[in-house]
Design a protein with these regions (language model features):
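Positively charged n-region of N-terminal signal peptides that target proteins for export
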Residues: 1-4
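Sec-dependent N-terminal signal peptides
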Residues: 6-8
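C-terminal motif of bacterial Sec signal peptides marking the signal peptidase cleavage site
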Residues: 13-16
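Surface-exposed, beta-sheet-biased, low-hydrophobicity segments with strongly acidic/polar composition
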Residues: 18-356
Length: 356
């Protein structure tokens, strides 16, 4: 009887050890879908944040936010890349209340997007999205208060409200004006000072970091924090208008752009199907064993960018297939199937994806 008990106990212990050693496998709650993100038409008024594992999204109008305060250990602040915002340091300024329009009249000419001058890239954030060590228009926020400059902020453009020719887009409407800002540290938080250019008093607000999110967003127009991105683990792709760079020509505004959530540990790479091969067949046959892990990019949010479409032919680039790995370690294959709707209007993209 004792021998039987020992065998039973030994078997139970072995099974327990094996269970402890089993690798936990994350199973996607959603296997894939055909998706039509709500960009909103030819003025592309919306940003859409999409989560592949659940086939869910959140949407906001592009001008709903102005500044993005980074939640990591670094103190970094981004500007709204979807509405042609720009920011430049006001040299010699030490008192935000004494800055006037007259003082910055020359700087206004420079702090612009799409001037086709190479050096204007200094007035936008590095489009790769590397907020930790990359360049931002507003410099890293120093622990020494006096080292934090006052910035002239071009507030960019409102959503265009007029008629748009079929097949075209209009990414910007009326100018949103100018502001002056200064940002310092307040313990583990940020202190934001801001005002209209000729105001002689300013507003102040404390912005706290929230580690569940990549950023805390703030609207200078509405004087409040705003909800924009989902929690950093709950989105993979962003569909948006975007301020990018043209080599040798500086900043420029791009429509139909797709960003990857690199800061939330989402990676991606593109497979370009060679001429002579059927892209649909290649897509259908792609499986997890075909993934090349070393090609996944985590340091450039533009891996998809505008490479999925051809604006001149108003069609998708059918040769491009995208491999995406989300923050839970799930893999997806994705391709775009439409740039316009049946009326040939822009701002109605479609894509399909499947879990690998």
């Amino acid at each position: 009887m004792k021998k039987i008990l020992l065998v039973i106990i030994g078997t139970m212990m072995l099974q327990s050890c094996l269970k402890d050693r089993e690798e936990k496998i994350t199973v996607a709650p959603f296997e894939g879908a055909i998706v039509e993100p709500n960009i909103g038409g030819s003025a592309e008024p919306n940003q859409v944040w999409f989560d592949l594992s659940t086939n869910t999204h959140t949407t906001n109008e592009r001008p709903k936010w102005d500044l993005a305060f980074y939640s990591g250990k670094e103190f970094r602040v981004g500007i709204n890349y979807s509405i042609m915002m720009a920011a430049g340091k006001i040299e010699g300024a030490t008192d935000i209340d004494k800055v006037t329009s007259e003082m910055v009249s020359d700087l206004k000419e420079d702090v612009q997007v799409a001037t086709f001058t190479p050096d204007n890239e200094r007035y936008i954030d590095n489009p790769e999205g590397n907020y930790i060590s990359g360049r931002t228009a507003i410099g890293e926020i120093s622990a020494t208060e006096k080292d934090n400059a006052i910035y002239l902020v071009n507030m960019g453009k409102e959503i265009y409200k007029g008629d748009i020719e079929k097949g075209s887009v209009s990414t910007g409407g009326d100018a949103r004006g100018w502001m002056k800002v200064q940002i310092t540290r307040e313990g583990s938080a940020y202190k934001l000072k801001y005002a209209k250019l000729d105001d002689t008093t300013h507003k102040e607000v404390i912005i706290h970091k929230n580690p569940q999110y990549n950023f805390t967003f703030f609207s200078l127009k509405d004087n409040k924090e705003v909800n924009i991105q989902p929690e950093k683990k709950n989105w993979d792709l962003c569909f948006t208008v975007f301020t990018n760079l043209i080599p040798g020509a500086g900043s420029y505004i791009y429509s139909d752009f797709v960003l990857v959530n690199n800061l939330g540990n989402v990676g991606a790479y593109v497979i370009s199907v060679p001429n002579g091969q059927n892209a649909t067949e290649v897509y259908n046959k792609l499986s997890k064993k075909d993934i090349e892990e070393n090609k996944l990019s985590y340091n450039d949010q533009r891996t998809i960018g505008g490479s999925w479409r051809d604006v001149f032919s108003k069609s998708v680039n059918a040769k491009n297939i995208y491999i995406i790995k989300d923050s839970d370690g799930l893999y997806y294959k994705l391709r775009f199937t439409r740039l316009t709707n049946i009326k040939e209007e822009r701002g109605y993209p479609q894509f399909e994806y499947k879990t690998l």
